[in-house]
């Protein structure tokens, strides 16, 4: 029996139903690195997964980076579920609606390769994984399968998936995606973090790490001065204002339509909204793994329908 593993291949992070790690990948060639944490051995080479951030790669199939990160994600999820390292897997993945039809066949082929099973070692454990199937679903909309009541309560709503590089927008009418309204803004969390880092450097001369900025944006502990923390919070509010403005300019009236916000950037917006924004209604799905969970439920539902047919 095969298991379903949902994977959200973000620019900023890779998420499964139970795991989340940065979408960074460092190659060490044939030389074993100093650490076992995140260490992937594949094809005679060593890679460390989850280290930092890789350059923006608009075509995720352009090289093997996202395939290698997929193997790491499978290993992490299998370990988290307590499953054997030799098993069959069905991958449930996702793409933005703006590029869904164009990129779906290519992305599916990229993940579903002919050489099966896939043999690799992750963090010292040997895996032999047979990838039986790759199903691709629309990002954001699939996540709503985790909160089905949201689709029943409103005739129209705006879905805002705040990812690493883009914010994907789509209106949903009577629980059906209005595909012709799909719009993508290059205002994801990478842009937000980079702008904050530059502003802090400009005002204080200090160079913050991504992890420091992310912690402060989330309201978590970080040893910095009050001056730096104030700059980060002001920039978080500025980012939120910019995002709301760009969404309105894209033709979505946030004063008239409820919005569901999800993805890694949703927590930032939730902390920096103000009553003066006068939004109609905002619903936050703050678990950054919600897309991966939605992909799994979508594939399970498809499989059920096939078995009942």
Protein language model regions, located:
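Nucleotide/phosphate-binding catalytic cleft detector across ATP-hydrolyzing
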Residues: 1-157, 176-191, 203, 210-309
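Conserved blade-register residue in beta-propeller folds
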Residues: 16, 169-171
């Amino acid at each position: 029996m095969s298991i379903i593993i949902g994977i959200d291949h973000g620019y900023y992070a890779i998420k499964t139903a139970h795991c989340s790690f940065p979408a960074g990948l460092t190659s060490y060639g044939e030389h074993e690195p100093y650490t076992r944490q995140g260490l992937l051995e594949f094809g005679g080479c060593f890679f460390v997964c989850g280290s930092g951030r890789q350059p923006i790669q608009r075509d995720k199939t352009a090289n093997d980076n996202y395939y290698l990160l997929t193997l790491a994600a499978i290993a992490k999820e299998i370990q988290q579920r307590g499953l054997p390292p030799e098993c069959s897997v069905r991958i449930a993945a996702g793409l933005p609606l703006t590029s869904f039809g164009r990129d779906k066949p290519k992305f599916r082929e990229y993940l579903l390769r002919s050489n099966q099973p896939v043999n690799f070692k992750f963090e010292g454990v040997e895996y032999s994984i047979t990838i039986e199937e790759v199903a691709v679903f629309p990002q954001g909309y699939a996540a709503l399968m985790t909160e089905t009541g949201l689709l029943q309560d409103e005739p129209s709503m705006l879905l805002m998936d705040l990812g690493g590089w883009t914010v994907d927008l789509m209106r949903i009418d009577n629980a059906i995606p209005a595909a012709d309204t799909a719009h993508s803004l290059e205002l994801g969390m990478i842009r937000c973090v980079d702008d904050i880092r530059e502003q802090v450097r400009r005002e204080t001369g200090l160079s913050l790490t991504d992890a420091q900025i992310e912690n402060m944006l989330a309201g978590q502990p970080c040893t910095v001065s009050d001056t730096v923390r104030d700059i980060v919070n002001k920039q978080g509010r500025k980012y939120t204002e910019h995002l709301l403005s760009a969404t309105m300019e894209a033709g979505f009236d946030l004063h008239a339509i409820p919005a569901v916000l999800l993805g890694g950037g949703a927590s930032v917006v939730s902390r920096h909204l103000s009553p003066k924004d006068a939004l109609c209604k905002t619903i936050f799905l703050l678990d950054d793994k919600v897309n991966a969970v939605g992909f799994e439920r979508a594939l399970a539902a498809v499989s059920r329908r096939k078995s009942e047919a």
